[in-house]
Amino acid sequence: MIHVYNTLSREKEAFHAITPGKVNMYVCGPTVYNYIHIGNARSAIAFDVIRRYLEYSGYVVNYVSNFTDVDDKIIQRAREEGVDEMTIADKYAQAFDEDTIPLNIKPATTRSRATAVIPDIIAFVEDLIHKGYAYESAGDVYFRAKKFKGYGILAHQDLAEMEANAAGRLDDQELTRKEDPIDFAVWKASHSSDEISWVSPWGKGRPGWHIECSVMAQKYLADTIDIHGGGIDLAFPHHTNEIAQSEARTGQTFVNYWLHNGFVNVNDEKMSKSLGNFTTVHDMLAHYDDPMVIRYLLATTQYRRPINYAPDTLEQARAELERIRTAYRNVFFRISTAKTGHDDSVDYAIAEHISHFREAMDDDFNTQNAIASIFELVTIANNYASRDEIKLDTATRLTHAIADLMNVFGVNGLSEHLTLSAEAQALLDKRVQARAVRDFNLSDQLRDQLSDMGIIVEDTTQGQRWHHA
């Protein structure tokens, strides 16, 4: 059984889906005013791995995520560039897709923009006002935080401390408009004619950030959902406010399991755009030749733990991934000459390590322990490939096991590294023939020719092997 760490309870809990065999999952997406950085990608990949493992375990996952495409940061960026807000939002929403496709992040079942649900947001706010949880003030609409019992419990925030901190951040006008400093905006009045806005019962304005996710989760999933994910920095105030407004409206539990991923750190500081210590995925993909190495690094650290990012961590990830690819390749090349049948002891070891992988992933998606099981399969693969004789069923089972488990991490393409052009394949075949008649001069010439094409050839006791440089 899968157990997950629920931020709300601060405990690992057995996972029980609301509907057996199906999971409703919402994950906060980016505010589209810039290219995503590695920290943003870490969150997207962490929950992509969780989704993949749930699917591997037999669940059908309805995965919803969003683009926040109306926000102060987007408005500011639009003013700086002299364009309208939707031009900025469209540009960086498209960039998100372009950056996440090479990282093999599965498309959401539904990816909604906040601006696509404005009527739903207005109806949601009207319900909150009707129930006494929200009030209009000078065109803004605020949520009465203290009216909601348990406000702040997700992030273990103390009300008095929150009130003091909020009061210190607000100017006199904001303090005058609010009944209480910790009340938060669910609708913001428009204060400029050149600012994006919509007509509402309270005048022209736009939604507050927090209400957007509440509306989309309920619209595309349900009033109560199984899993809500996001970075740990979203626990307060974003997810705290989502809980308050969602449960105030429906009277039902909003989310059964709250999951939060850890930061990506640079020199022990959180990577963020505000600190200016970020590296965009866009830049990394432009300068790094293998996106799966980036994916591997971000996928194989347990999702709640921080990642210290540095160039040498990428090189370590590259080396580890190459070990896996090499082991896969070693067995793959033996399949064509393998004997019919299977080896019971190796089959048993394969099944044992698949079971260990599942045990690790069942324990709050512990990818660090799960990858250790894959490296046990790597050892088995290398040892098996070095035998004088191997069996077809076992060799096939071994390559499938490695590929299937790596696919849970979203690190695919093991077999893609074994594809060749027709020209390269012809040279390899010619080299086999040359060695068969002991024409080693021609064999060496062909090896050099293949090397110039980026293909490294090795001669082993089991025959010729190759890999891309």
Swiss-Prot record:
| Protein name, UniProt field | Cysteine--tRNA ligase
Q: What do the Gene Ontology cellular component annotations say?
A: cytosol
Q: Which family does it belong to?
A: Belongs to the class-I aminoacyl-tRNA synthetase family.
User: Which transformation does this protein catalyse, written as a reaction?
Assistant: tRNA(Cys) + L-cysteine + ATP = L-cysteinyl-tRNA(Cys) + AMP + diphosphate
Motif 'HIGH' region residues?
Answer: 30-40
Q: Name one GO molecular function term.
A: cysteine-tRNA ligase activity
Cofactor: how and how many bound: Binds 1 zinc ion per subunit.
Q: Identify the keywords attached in UniProt to this record, alphabetized.
A: Aminoacyl-tRNA synthetase, ATP-binding, Cytoplasm, Ligase, Metal-binding, Nucleotide-binding, Protein biosynthesis, Zinc
Q: Which domain of life is it from?
A: Bacteria
Q: Which top EC class is named for this enzyme in its record?
A: ligase
Q: Would I find Cell wall biogenesis/degradation among this entry's keywords?
A: no
The answer, when asked if Cytoplasm is one of the entry's keywords, is yes
Principal subcellular localisation of the protein: cytoplasm
| Subunit comment | Monomer.
* Residues reported in the UniProt entry to bind Zn(2+): 28, 213, 238, 242
Organism field: Leuconostoc citreum (strain KM20)
Q: Which InterPro entries match?
A: Cys-tRNA-ligase (IPR015803), Cys-tRNA-synt_Ia_DALR (IPR015273), Cys-tRNA/MSH_ligase (IPR024909), CysS_C (IPR056411), Rossmann-like_a/b/a_fold (IPR014729), tRNA-synt_1_cat_dom (IPR032678), tRNAsynth_Ia_anticodon-bd (IPR009080)
**For binding ATP, which residues are annotated in this chain's numbering?**
273
